[in-house]
């Protein structure tokens, strides 16, 4: 069982950088639990405020429910209560409810509720989906606002009134006006998490809108760099932040944007570049080509 209340979990998450580890696969695309556990042990040396197991960077979309349970239980066992472990839930409402209950049974500290699969919906439908998951578990819920599941501030405020365990809002939209309206309406009722791809890009301006943390995929292969960058953001050291954006993050994004799906593929390529092979990505994702891998390795350079 989770050792934190939902409110306590949310406060902890908002206090530091968040880790979104990749999921390790063998060459035959099966889950490599030993390598996954070894990697979590390595990353445990670096202080983060939360670990999101089997999230987007962890290829949630390609994992079976049984595999998600294995990944999650491995993360809970390896962190040994030192770091809150957040589990994924998604797809349709019935499956999301099952995932949330399974995560609670596995010892997770919270749930990241991903958008429903494909279908578009009105605000009332999204609210019903989220409320059903909140009522299915005592764990704290973080709603992931993105794609086909974009809440407005009125819907979110109503959910917060009805669901005390709705404690987090992760933004994957990048709508500054919406974020301003949400924070103006709800203030510290929620913990706000930056969830755009390569979230470092938006971390400094988002800090001014109450977004005190973000999920760092780069942490997978450059943990010291990622923590240093986060520290610069929290200190509002504009010179340091924009130097690293110019010299590393923006060139990294240029590689990431070359093909669809590279937001995950480039992270595993980065791990290989620093000698921490995490195996292939699962279809429908594709690997970086040899020239792109060489370019990424050169960009990482002595930051490893």
UniProtKB/Swiss-Prot annotation:
Belongs to the DapA family. SUPFAM superfamilies: Aldolase. PANTHER family: 5-DEHYDRO-4-DEOXYGLUCARATE DEHYDRATASE 2-RELATED, DIHYDRODIPICOLINATE SYNTHASE. SMART domains: DHDPS. GO terms for biological process: D-glucarate catabolic process. It comes from Methylobacterium radiotolerans (strain ATCC 27329 / DSM 1819 / JCM 2831 / NBRC 15690 / NCIMB 10815 / 0-1). Pathway: Carbohydrate acid metabolism; D-glucarate degradation; 2,5-dioxopentanoate from D-glucarate: step 2/2. It is an enzyme of class 4 (lyase). Coiled coil: none annotated. InterPro entries: Aldolase_TIM (IPR013785), DapA-like (IPR002220), Dehydro-deoxyglucarate_dehyd (IPR017655). This is Probable 5-dehydro-4-deoxyglucarate dehydratase. Gene3D superfamilies: Aldolase class I (3.20.20.70). It catalyses: 5-dehydro-4-deoxy-D-glucarate + H(+) = 2,5-dioxopentanoate + CO2 + H2O. The keyword Transport does not apply. Its EC number is 4.2.1.41.
């Amino acid at each position: 069982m989770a050792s934190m209340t939902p409110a306590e979990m949310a406060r902890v998450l908002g206090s530091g950088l968040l880790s979104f580890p990749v999921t390790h696969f063998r060459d035959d695309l099966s889950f490599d639990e030993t390598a996954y556990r070894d990697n979590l042990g390595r990353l445990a040396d670096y202080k983060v405020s939360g670990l999101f197991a089997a999230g987007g960077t962890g290829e949630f979309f390609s994992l079976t429910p049984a595999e998600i349970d294995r990944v999650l239980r491995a993360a809970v066992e390896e962190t040994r209560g030192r770091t809150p472990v957040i589990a994924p839930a998604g797809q349709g409402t019935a499956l999301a409810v099952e995932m949330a209950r399974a995560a609670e049974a596995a010892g997770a500290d919270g749930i990241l509720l991903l958008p429903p699969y494909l279908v578009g919906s009105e605000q009332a439908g999204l609210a019903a989906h989220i409320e059903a998951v909140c009522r299915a578990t005592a764990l704290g819920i973080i709603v992931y606002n993105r794609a086909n599941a974009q809440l407005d501030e009125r819907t979110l405020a109503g959910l917060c009134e009805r669901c005390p365990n709705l404690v987090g809002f992760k933004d994957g939209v990048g709508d500054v006006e919406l974020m301003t309206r949400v924070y103006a309406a709800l203030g510290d009722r929620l913990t706000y998490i930056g969830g755009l791809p390569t979230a470092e890009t938006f971390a400094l301006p988002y800090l001014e809108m109450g977004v005190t943390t973000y999920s760092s995929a780069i942490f997978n292969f450059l943990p010291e760099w990622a923590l240093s960058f986060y520290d610069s953001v929290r200190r509002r050291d504009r010179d340091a932040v924009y130097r690293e954006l110019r010299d590393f993050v923006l060139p990294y994004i240029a590689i990431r944007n070359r093909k669809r799906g590279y937001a995950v593929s480039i992270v595993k390529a980065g791990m290989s570049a620093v000698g921490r092979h995490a195996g292939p990505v699962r279809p429908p994702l594709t690997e970086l080509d040899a020239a792109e891998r060489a370019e990424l390795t050169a960009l990482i350079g002595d930051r490893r």
